[in-house]
Amino acid sequence: SLIPALSMANAARDRGQVESSVSKAIRFSMIIAIPAAVGMAVMSKPIISLLFGAKNSEKAVLMMRLGSAGIIFYSLSTVSNAILQGTSHMRIPVRHALMSLCIHVVVLLTFLNVFHMGIFGVVFADMIFAFCMCFFNAVSVRRLLTYKQEVKRTFAGPALCAAVMGVFAWFLYGALYRIFTGFAYRVLAGTVITVIAAMALYAALLVRTGCITEYELTYFPKGKQLTAFFKKLRLLK
């Protein structure tokens, strides 16, 4: 949905609408991607246990924890690709992908053949590919659209809220795991409860800290109901 909106604003030469659409797209993607990365890192052990079993899962857990940052980079690169395409710069993301792929191949071969990092080299090389895409796209967006990225409410705020959420989830899951001792599905129960509670806490923190305003809530599905709910909890004034 981002590309048509940007294309219309760009065709009308409405720079204000273009910048507004770009800002909203990046902000909303980071609001989702940053806590997702934190959640995958914190909950990597129970998630791997549920998917593949707990036996000999230490390496897989570590891979998920290390690679979770890639969620942020891939999300940002996907959005920035759409921004460039929606503003009539169709070939630039392709060129950036080719450049990033070349860097990825060189880094991957170095990690595997020089540093002998094994599968972890693949994880880090994949993240470097996504990071390069983000970097190249960001430079082009700034140069072509004269767009200056806001940092506080787009990156710093969600990161702080996600960090609090991550600490909360870590301790809550540990407590639930001990409470459910003897219960056959304690990993599943602990994971589901922790994820739901952590999501609720993160949403409350976003609203309370002003990372999301009442006006911006209306852009979400069931926005009016969410606004009324947060006002009842006195998280919105």
What are these regions (language model features)?
Residues S1-I26, N81-I83:
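Helix-loop junctions and terminal segments of transmembrane helices
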Residues S21, I26-V42, I119-L144, A159:
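Short alpha-helical transmembrane segments in multi-pass integral membrane proteins
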Residues K24, A37, P46, I71, ...:
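Residue-level recognition of pore/gate-forming positions within transmembrane alpha-helices
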Residues S29, M64-G67, I71, A97-L98, ...:
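Residue-level recognition of transmembrane alpha-helices
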Residues M40-I71, T181, Y185:
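Interfacial segments at transmembrane-helix termini and the short loops linking adjacent helices
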Residues A69-M99:
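Membrane-interface junctions at transmembrane-helix termini in multi-pass inner-membrane proteins
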Residues R91, L101-V139, R143, Q149, ...:
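Membrane-interface helix-loop junctions in multi-pass transport and translocation proteins
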Residues Y173-K237:
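Membrane-proximal transmembrane or re-entrant/amphipathic helices at the cytosolic face
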